[in-house]
Design a protein with these regions (language model features):
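C-terminal and inter-domain tail/linker signature
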Residues: 1-129
Length: 129
């Protein structure tokens, strides 16, 4: 398995995201994001970017593990503080990215984070609607 392309794409993606740049350029035109616990599916580069921007605003203290790479895929495990209460409970998640032709073609999020951006309609300036 050659993980060279997935590593380059994901590194570029998180670099853009971390600098506040337009990470939608890392997505295929028909990209989709699926959050399984709420059944949310968001399609399109701009729509996925906006959804994730709102989602991240509602995920305090995100911590991630080292990224795992495979042929045409990358996997990120992490957790965030539960914003619903002041306990030390954390919400675990795993994101699986599909990668082809130098872009992210799909991403699937496993974990109970759907409530953080429940309807998929996110205004980048204000977070989930």
């Amino acid at each position: 398995m050659d993980a060279t392309e997935p590593r380059a794409v994901i590194t570029h993606y998180f670099d853009f995201m971390g600098r506040g740049e337009d990470f939608a350029t890392c997505y295929a035109e028909d990209v989709s994001w699926t959050t399984f616990d709420g059944g949310t599916v968001v399609s399109g580069p701009t729509e996925v970017r906006d959804y994730l921007t709102g989602l991240h605003r509602n995920m305090p203290d995100i911590q991630t593990r080292p990224i795992a790479y495979a042929d045409e895929a990358a996997y990120v495990e992490g957790d965030c503080a539960d914003p619903r209460n002041a306990s030390t409970d954390r919400i675990p998640f795993c994101i699986a990215y599909d990668i082809a032709n130098g872009v992210i073609t799909a991403a699937r999020c496993y974990g109970s984070i759907g409530f953080l951006a429940p309807d998929g309609r996110v205004d980048p300036a204000s977070g989930p609607s």
